[in-house]
Amino acid sequence: MSIDIDIIKARAKNEYRLSKVRGEAMISVRIPGGILPAHLLTVARDIAETWGNGQIHLTTRQKLAMPGIRYEDIDNVNAALEPFLREIEIELCDVQVEDTKAGYLAIGGRNIVACQGNRICQKANTDTTGLSRRLEKLVYPSPYHLKTVIVGCPNDCAKASMADLGIIGVAKMRFTADRCIGCGACVKACSHHAVGCLALKNGKAVKEESACIGCGECVLACPTLAWQRKPDQLWQVRLGGRTSKKTPRVGKLFLNWVTEDVIKQVIVNLYEFEKEMLGGKPIYLHMGHLIDKGGYLRFKERVLRGVQLNPEAMVAERIYWAEDESVARMHLKPAGH
């Protein structure tokens, strides 16, 4: 049996994706930060085996997707998703959900992607998992498109630079000169892994402060703990990164050394900027396209309106987009010429 259904509305409202198989869709579940209680995997398995085709897809946005859902089974699947909504959205992320058996409420604000952060990774400066969960209620449920990626250090393993909103954990360093033995380990690490802003002078490490990106490689390399991260969790914000057929580009630096409170205020204003640029209609466009449409100065004024910046914060005066060869393809010639 097959039924007629507006799959576009089902996608926008309940996270169902159209399948090339007639009469079928794929449901995906939100996992902010990509970490979930292990027992919820059995819930996903049961959905896949009971109503799907027995398979689970690990999506590029750290979600679990179950293909092969028949249209007539959508209500049953929505009800079966209750543990995900209750344990992740409500209990872990503090999202207000009135009916946990009605399925997901929107797809606009995409699942927040994150690396494992400093709960696991020694290179990470910040707690990406915690931030992902605290930001979830600001991006979901919303009909307006926003792709967010959070990483714990400038290594950017999860590709925050390719997201509408890329959030990168950075750290201010504390240097205790009396502990420095002049071994040069930090200088070598910074030169090899980072930006080369350290040098040895009179047997002690010195830093060119303006060049430091706050990655923390010096902290990992120092055998005497002369370099240590300051306890404040700070972030860098990049905007406008995207893949896509229409002018793919790497995101540009917008804010540096900002606090979590600043990021929360910025996200609220990002959605207001989207609404203004789209005339109140949640049309699918990347943030970079909207910045192009409105201009950076207009964007900056709207997004920073009412935001209380912390003393360390830095703001990009302008952003310059340099398109790559993906559009013109002027460097390509027929083979053999």
Curated annotation (Swiss-Prot):
Its cofactor is [4Fe-4S] cluster; siroheme. One of its GO terms (molecular function) is metal ion binding. The anaerobic sulfite reductase seems to consist of three subunits. Its EC number is 1.8.1.-. Keywords: 4Fe-4S, Cytoplasm, Electron transport, Heme, Iron, Iron-sulfur, Metal-binding, NAD, Oxidoreductase, Repeat, Transport. Residues 171-200, 203-232 form the 4Fe-4S ferredoxin-type domain. [4Fe-4S] cluster 2 binds at C180, C183, C186, C222. InterPro entries: 4Fe4S_Fe-S-bd, 4Fe4S_Fe_S_CS, NiRdtase/SiRdtase_haem-b_fer, Nit/Sulf_reduc_fer-like_dom_sf, NO2/SO3_Rdtase_4Fe4S_dom, NO2/SO3_Rdtase_4Fe4S_prot, NO2/SO3_Rdtase_4Fe4S_sf, NO2/SO3_Rdtase_FeS/sirohaem_BS. Binds 3 [4Fe-4S] clusters per subunit. The keyword Chaperone does not apply. This is Anaerobic sulfite reductase subunit C. [4Fe-4S] cluster 3 binds at C190, C212, C215, C218. It comes from Salmonella typhimurium (strain LT2 / SGSC1412 / ATCC 700720). The lineage of its organism: Bacteria, Pseudomonadati, Pseudomonadota, Gammaproteobacteria, Enterobacterales. Siroheme binds at C157. This enzyme catalyzes the hydrogen sulfide production from sulfite. It is strictly anaerobic. It is regulated by electron acceptors rather than by cysteine. Its main location: cytoplasm.
